[in-house]
């Protein structure tokens, strides 16, 4: 039995990475801890995070391949060692990283003899994680030309019936960048109180690091709960319809009124850190510009001057005016 000594916070809730390694280009591992937690909280967070990590994080895959003069998926071509089916399976395994929206086109044009690998794919705005991934072996001086379709989604999608008429074949797509996630709980006694430490293990395919996956999962989870903080006031009617009560609307401003003055600035920053630019409903082009500049939250956006924003590639004066207008509308955040 292996024993580890870990220094954990006993007062303020904190998380940290206690182990990180790269087993291969397509296998990253990270182990994280979160503490201190009250009894029962670790299991709640662990189960929720595992479900989000495995099902809610987007990934990029090749979803369709097209090549002319192919009668069916299980046919072979003279001069190519693999069958068409084997080539499609190899394309399915290609790991990609991107921030694209919608569908993109890519292609392979290779003249044999030689080995076709992932580095031979012409991919606009998409990164291949492992250029050495094998696709096909051309044993004769022939041309192999394949048109590819690339998509970014979440979860997985089983291929539909192939359209044989135009030589187009759908590919089973696994969009999940997280290969696996596990959690475990360690209980300990702090004074007279029983507390817990949550251990979270994450394996990814290399398109995201475990830390990036944890960040994305946390952001997605926050987005799911944000509407509850801004729910409209509702009247609760009792069965006798004689007594009515209105639930007060919780806002960040209401909360700030009850904290000490010296904590207001910190509270405001914490709030802004939890509000992501995804929630501002920005046009895709502005959103992509901010993302490429590593601006993910409203706090990070407010920390940028107008001059900083105008230095962003493809960012225009009209975009700046639009953002300023959005922030003015959302003034309860700032």
Swiss-Prot record:
The catalytic activity, as recorded, is: RNA(n) + a ribonucleoside 5'-triphosphate = RNA(n+1) + diphosphate
Outline what the protein does: DNA-dependent RNA polymerase catalyzes the transcription of DNA into RNA using the four ribonucleoside triphosphates as substrates.
Its EC number is 2.7.7.6
Q: Which domain of life is it from?
A: Eukaryota
Q: Show the Pfam families listed in the entry.
A: RNA_pol_A_bac (PF01000), RNA_pol_A_CTD (PF03118), RNA_pol_L (PF01193)
Name the enzyme's class.
transferase
Q: Where is this region: Alpha N-terminal domain (alpha-NTD)?
A: 1-232
What's the source species for this entry? Pisum sativum (Garden pea)
Write the gene name.
rpoA
Q: Does the keyword Signal apply?
A: no
Q: What is this protein called?
A: DNA-directed RNA polymerase subunit alpha
Q: Where is this region: Alpha C-terminal domain (alpha-CTD)?
A: 267-334
Instruction: Identify the taxonomic lineage of the organism of origin.
Output: Eukaryota, Viridiplantae, Streptophyta, Embryophyta, Tracheophyta
Q: Where does it localize?
A: Plastid, Chloroplast
